[in-house]
Amino acid sequence: MIYYNRTRIYIYGQYKNIPRIKKGHTMKLNIRLTAAILACASILTSASACSSQNASSATDSKNESSIAESSSAESKDNTKSDTTSDNSSASSESTASSDGSSSENKKPVGVDGVQTNGQLVVDIDGHTWGISLYGGGDGANYASYLNEFKEKVGSSVNVFNMVVPTAGAYYLPEGYEKYNASHRDSINSIANKLVNVINVDGYAALEAHTNEYIYTRTDHHWEPLGAYYAAKAFCEMAQVPVKELSTYKAETIEGFVGTMYAFTEYNERIKNDPDTFTYYIPSTDYTATYYTTDFKVDEQFTQFHSIFVDQPASGAYSTFMGGDQKIVKIETANKNGRKLCIFKDSYGNAEVPFFIDSFEEIYVCDIRYFDLYAPDFIKDNGITDVLFTMCTFSAVGENAEGIKNNLLSK
């Protein structure tokens, strides 16, 4: 199954970016189309190989629940520890990893599991989940781009990295491990490659709260509650104030059915078990100004100064700033001299409300849609802190190339 939007193609469970022309640059159309065709061909070849591997490894053509149930019985007395968590060494600027009892080894029991288009639909504790299966990766390019960025902005700017896992890291049921790579391995690999970039252990921050509603079941994103715990870990590392969740005003959107419905080829089980999406409004006063991706005032938003945009239930995750293709500047009532620039994917959107209590100014920028030379942007706006925050799929995949092609390209 193939899904297309303006900048990405979704093919058999993988994302692939469409080549994008940065404003002020030119590219011959035939080159752009050729690149897109080659990219798609590569993904299709990979997907075909993956499908063949899955087919050959399955011993029963019935749904995956039989695999899960038999594997569950075998694993109860034989739980293996995550060797990467046990053996990983953090640099002096990295947070400590969680202890050896990783949630990737404490699997829930799932029933009626079905794999579709690189996604798993499975019932866990009475609710249906859609879980994206993770292919893994060492994030070498991502880490090298952050190191290059840090070198260009110099010692006067604090640069942080916080890569977070998707739901499969914690909630993939027993019996499906062979279809899913370790998020912890990828996050550790990135952390170990960073030079003078401060690592925030987003995995551990979320792992401590897996018994709470921190991920959506019907969407590939997290719940804002999960974003709060990650944002709190970053603020503590950055040594800025962070308020307790009880100081925020909770707003709820019922009946949210997100992207997993389409990703699973419109599985009715996903549609019939929607999420409750709860987001949190900070008490600190602020004003948001919306800009285009080349930092011109967006005329569509000149009268709008909130970071929350009313959405129907189907678009609940777009409550945060209405989406990604923009730069948002937030001026808060804080006067601590700390100015934060967030370079993120869509996961980062849900973190933004939790930084309003902590920084004087915040600039929200998406690595996929940024038409300026980022080191100059940091200098020109007097930014003191930069946070790269995104999910593992982005950090080890094509989205990371946006850092090189957009942020670090003049």
Range-by-range predicted roles:
Residues 2-26:
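Short, Lys/Arg-enriched N-terminal segments with co-localized hydrophobic residues
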Residues 23-24, 29, 49-69, 74-410:
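Extracellular glycan-modifying ectodomains
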Residues 29-53:
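Sec-dependent N-terminal signal peptides of Gram-positive bacterial secreted proteins and lipoproteins
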